């Protein structure tokens, strides 16, 4: 997809000198694609267990789910310029890496505004775009069929089936654009993707502490919380 857009930009740049009659204000639509990175987690949970001992009270140990990880991805964007400096836009991204403890693959959709100042060869903007982020394996609340699990705490992750979970997101940040020609642009984004997590259950890796080195994967409840996650992208686009 990005190769196709890049090819279109190249040919449009070659022919741009023959289309000077069309003003920038008449180029209302923008389409493009981007590579993006999102530094996020699937919520944070912890479990506390009692370690075996001969004489009570026995000591306890707390294990916590994994923190933030940087996820590479790609996506597409479309915009409509209400004025030269104010744009309505929609963007979708897909992060294909499937990590067992990171909520699986992630997809993102954002819809909002971009406002700032566009100059002859560059533009600087702020953006505000609400939307959502979907984790393909974001919740471990559904019991796995056909598996009889003993009622122990913390419950083993093998007793549950991973299901998708969608959370509200809000993208706040800045945009810098460079215009190789009147029709084409190169875009750089940086911002804070705010994710509002609802309560859900996530896997936690624990060491039983027996000295055997055998790790166990259990399930813990991640409470409702709001997290701040850096997201950056670089992309290309065409105006028409």
Residue ranges and their predicted role:
Residues 1-26:
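Cleavable N-terminal export/targeting peptides
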Residues 21-37:
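Short N-terminal segments immediately surrounding and downstream of signal-peptide cleavage
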Residues 32-39, 77-170, 178-182, 186-187, ...:
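Gram-negative (and chloroplast) outer-membrane scaffold detector with strong preference
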Residues 42-66, 137-163, 198-223:
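Solvent-exposed loop segments that connect transmembrane elements
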Residues 183-190, 194-207:
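C-terminal beta-signal and adjacent terminal beta-strands/loops
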Residues 47-94:
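N-terminal, post-signal-peptide region of Sec/Tat-exported proteins
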Residues 15-19, 31, 228:
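Intrinsic low-complexity/disordered segments
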């Amino acid at each position: 997809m990005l190769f196709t857009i890049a090819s279109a930009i190249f040919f449009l740049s070659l022919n741009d000198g023959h289309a000077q009659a069309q003003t920038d204000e008449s180029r209302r639509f923008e389409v493009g694609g981007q590579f993006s990175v999102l530094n996020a987690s699937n919520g944070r949970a912890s479990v506390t267990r009692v370690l075996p001992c001969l004489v009570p009270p026995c000591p306890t140990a707390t294990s916590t789910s994994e923190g933030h990880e940087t996820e590479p991805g790609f996506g597409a964007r479309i915009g409509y310029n209400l004025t030269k400096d104010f744009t309505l836009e929609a963007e979708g991204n897909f992060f294909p890496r499937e990590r067992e403890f990171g909520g699986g693959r992630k997809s993102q959709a954002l819809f909002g505004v971009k406002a700032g100042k566009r100059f002859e060869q560059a533009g600087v903007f702020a953006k505000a775009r609400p939307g959502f982020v979907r984790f393909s394996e974001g919740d471990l609340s559904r019991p796995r069929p056909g598996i009889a699990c003993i009622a122990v705490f913390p419950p083993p992750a093998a007793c549950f089936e991973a299901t998708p979970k969608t959370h509200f997101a809000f993208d706040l940040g800045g945009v810098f654009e460079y215009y190789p020609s009147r029709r084409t642009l190169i875009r750089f984004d940086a911002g804070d993707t705010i994710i509002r997590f609802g309560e859900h259950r996530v896997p936690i890796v624990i060491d039983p502490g027996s000295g055997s080195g055998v790790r166990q994967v259990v399930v813990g409840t991640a409470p409702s919380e709001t997290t701040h996650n850096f997201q950056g992208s670089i992309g290309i686009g065409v105006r028409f």
